[in-house]
Amino acid sequence: MFYKLAQKVMFQMDPEKAHHFALNSLMATANTPLDCFYAQKIAPSPVEFMGVTFPNPVGLAAGMDKDGECIDGFHAMGFGHIEVGTVTPRPQPGNDLPRLFRLKPAKGIINRMGFNNKGVDNLIANLKAAKSGALIGVNIGKNKDTPVEQGKDDYLICMDKVYEYAAYIAVNISSPNTPGLRSLQYGDLLDDLLGSLKAKQKDLAQKHGKYVPIALKIAPDLSDEEIQKIADSLIKNQFDGAIATNTTLSRDGVSGLMNANETGGLSGKPLNLLSTSVIKKLSSCLNGQIPIIGVGGINSAADAIDKLDAGASMVQIYSGFIYQGPKLIKDIIEACRVRK
């Protein structure tokens, strides 16, 4: 009930202002008696994934809490893990405003944020300050002004800095809002990046005395052949996991709606079927050798179960969480418990 009232207010606001209002509210109320308005008691439903035991199979997808400012608030809602970022080596403002648009009739969102974040050093300070003990995935990317050919260096810088604070590291090469980024999903550039990250992981595991798994986040706008090549590269380079999928450039199911023609990646309910189909194909190509986090368009517990049935081991939510509220977390966990 409280969330529906809050949503009604926030949906009257500009989407990005509403986003900042929500984050500021969480920062102000986390670890205080006021967190009773959104905190949920959820019985553990542990999942083993990439060698890490997660308290439940539902995570917060990257992009909601880019700078890790609200970890304790989101943890109180019951998320089994929180993926912060995408973070880059240096702070950057992202793309020009406006850059975030609701497609309310379709329960969709279009964004062209452009990896706006306060930089990896600021993120680390926030990770150190968090009190909840939440499992944190750190989603890393490259700065906009770093040439694609040198993008690998940005990923290695971020990986080096976040390694000791992360439960896992997500490598984002699939945002449509950073020029040239998606080219890293193909051929020699992909193999070179994954091989370099795997070598860095080995060095950091020795340095810190712990193994932090790495996962690759992929786009939904891929051909069957491209999915196969990505799977082959993941297996060849012994990556620990895959995250499928990011936002789509497709406008299927939203044409004619207000804001549908805005440039950027489409998320939310219109992405659901496309994302699930990519998960199914990727799972087949990986043949059980590498586990998958399913994300993209989950708007109900049934949507989450579809992703698990397609081959995912865990799920993440973001746009569906905005439209449905914290109850969606609990609904999915309960459905997963029944599915077992």
UniProtKB/Swiss-Prot annotation:
Residues noted as binding FMN in the record, renumbered to the chain: 62-66, 86, 139, 172, 217, 245, 268, 297, 318-319
SUPFAM superfamilies: FMN-linked oxidoreductases
Chemical reaction(s) catalysed: (S)-dihydroorotate + a quinone = orotate + a quinol
Pathway linked to the protein: Pyrimidine metabolism; UMP biosynthesis via de novo pathway; orotate from (S)-dihydroorotate (quinone route): step 1/1
Catalytic residues of the enzyme: 175 (nucleophile)
One of the record's GO molecular function terms: dihydroorotate dehydrogenase (quinone) activity
UniProt-listed Pfam families: DHO_dh
PROSITE patterns with a match to the protein in the record: DHODEHASE_1, DHODEHASE_2
Classification via InterPro entries: Aldolase_TIM, DHO_dehydrogenase, Dihydroorotate_DH_1_2, Dihydroorotate_DH_2, Dihydroorotate_DH_cat, Dihydroorotate_DH_CS
One GO cellular component term: plasma membrane
Gene3D superfamilies according to UniProt: Aldolase class I
EC number: 1.3.5.2
Localization of this protein: Cell membrane
Enzyme class: oxidoreductase
Membrane topology of this protein: Peripheral membrane protein
Cofactor(s) this protein cannot do without: FMN
Details of cofactor binding: Binds 1 FMN per subunit.
UniProt-listed GO biological process terms: 'de novo' pyrimidine nucleobase biosynthetic process; 'de novo' UMP biosynthetic process
Disulfide bonds listed in the record: none
Residues engaged in binding substrate: 66, 111-115, 172, 177, 246-247
Keyword annotations of the record: Cell membrane, Flavoprotein, FMN, Membrane, Oxidoreductase, Pyrimidine biosynthesis
Subunit structure: Monomer.
Task performed by this protein: Catalyzes the conversion of dihydroorotate to orotate with quinone as electron acceptor.
Sequence similarity: Belongs to the dihydroorotate dehydrogenase family. Type 2 subfamily.
Protein name: Dihydroorotate dehydrogenase (quinone)
The species this protein was found in: Shewanella woodyi (strain ATCC 51908 / MS32)
UniProt gene name: pyrD
